[in-house]
């Protein structure tokens, strides 16, 4: 009697902040589990996204962007989370942006050179490159930097060549039993995903000052008798001025954030959601390792 073979492996998606790692993960999975915004440092935790197709299960780790600035405790922890993801995977997808190459890209590359896993280079946002003639010389420059498994120009936003990345991943998955049931798309809890959705809306609707200074704690997440979820979210900021910014004029901003977050939650959880949001000042949380631990920033290191 023949036993069907199965293939399974872990793939880290790495790169400097804001190159499109989370957008690529969402496209590879065919749905949204990692939060995205135009602001750098949107991803603060390692998100595991799972894509199962027949005998093949690819388990993607979406890391925080690696960067050289480590002044605050939260930045140091994010770098640690990203670095530790590189060490224990079968494959790495290194995401860079168009024809840009920065010291942070160089730093990520140096970390990858130290590792053993083969690396696919995904050159993202190629649709945004104004001077198309610059693209080929830049790809040749990148090819000279390391012995990449493959170099694929992509647009994570439009999906251009994302199927090529998925095919390369599938080809390099080792023979192994699947780690997760086939209907799983993430190993994160609904409570965690609710906090990430609220944080994404905060990033999307607030000014450039806020990304580092805001986080979300889910204080209550219960099923109700109507088959839906009652969720209470606490938004923590560092200063009184930021609290006013989050609430907005006559509460307009927090209302918009709540409406948009609720829509995404209902789509993700496939159930009606009753969401209530509060804002609280907790000064210095991003510098305080104990506070970060209590907010879940250290549990996956």
Swiss-Prot record:
Residues 7-175 form the Era-type G domain. GTP binds at residues 15-22, 62-66, 124-127. Residues 154-156 are annotated as: G5. CDD domains: Era (cd04163), KH-II_Era (cd22534). Disulfide bonds: none annotated. Residues 206-283 form the KH type-2 domain. Residues 124-127 are annotated as: G4. Coiled coil: none annotated. It is found in: Cytoplasm; Cell inner membrane. One of its GO terms (cellular component) is cytosol. Residues 41-45 are annotated as: G2. Residues 15-22 are annotated as: G1. InterPro entries: G_ERA_dom, GTP-bd, GTPase_Era-like, KH_dom-like_a/b, KH_dom_type_2, KH_sf_prok-type, P-loop_NTPase, Small_GTP-bd. NCBIfam families: era (TIGR00436), PRK00089.1 (NF000908), small_GTP (TIGR00231). Monomer. An essential GTPase that binds both GDP and GTP, with rapid nucleotide exchange. Plays a role in 16S rRNA processing and 30S ribosomal subunit biogenesis and possibly also in cell cycle regulation and energy metabolism. Belongs to the TRAFAC class TrmE-Era-EngA-EngB-Septin-like GTPase superfamily. Era GTPase family. This is GTPase Era. It comes from Shigella flexneri. The gene is era.
């Amino acid at each position: 009697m023949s036993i069907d073979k199965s293939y399974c492996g872990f793939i880290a998606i790495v790169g400097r902040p804001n190159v499109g790692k989370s957008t690529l993960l969402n496209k590879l999975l065919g749905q949204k589990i990692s939060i995205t915004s135009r602001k750098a440092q949107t991803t603060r935790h390692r998100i595991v996204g799972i894509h199962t197709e027949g005998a093949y299960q690819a388990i993607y780790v979406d890391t925080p962007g690696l960067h050289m600035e480590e002044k605050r405790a939260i930045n140091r922890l994010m770098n640690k989370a990203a670095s530790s993801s590189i060490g224990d995977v079968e494959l790495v997808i290194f995401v860079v942006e168009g024809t840009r190459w920065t010291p942070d890209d160089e730093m990520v590359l140096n970390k990858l050179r130290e590792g053993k896993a083969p690396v696919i280079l995904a050159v993202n946002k190629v649709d945004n490159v104004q001077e198309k003639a610059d693209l080929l010389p830049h790809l040749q420059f990148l090819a000279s930097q390391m012995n990449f498994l493959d170099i694929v120009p992509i647009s994570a936003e439009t999906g251009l060549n994302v199927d090529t990345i998925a095919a390369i991943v599938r080809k390099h998955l080792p023979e192994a039993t699947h780690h997760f049931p086939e209907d799983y798309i993430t190993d994160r809890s609904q409570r965690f995903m609710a906090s990430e959705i609220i944080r994404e809306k905060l990033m999307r609707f607030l000014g450039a000052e806020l990304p580092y200074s805001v986080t979300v704690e889910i204080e209550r997440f219960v099923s109700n008798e109507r088959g839906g979820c009652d969720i209470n979210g606490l938004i923590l900021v560092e200063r009184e001025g930021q609290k006013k910014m989050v609430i907005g004029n006559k509460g307009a901003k927090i209302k918009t954030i709540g409406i948009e977050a609720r829509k995404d939650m209902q789509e993700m959880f496939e159930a009606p959601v009753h969401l209530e949001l509060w804002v609280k000042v907790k000064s210095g949380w991003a510098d305080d390792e104990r506070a970060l631990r209590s907010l879940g920033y250290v549990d996956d290191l």
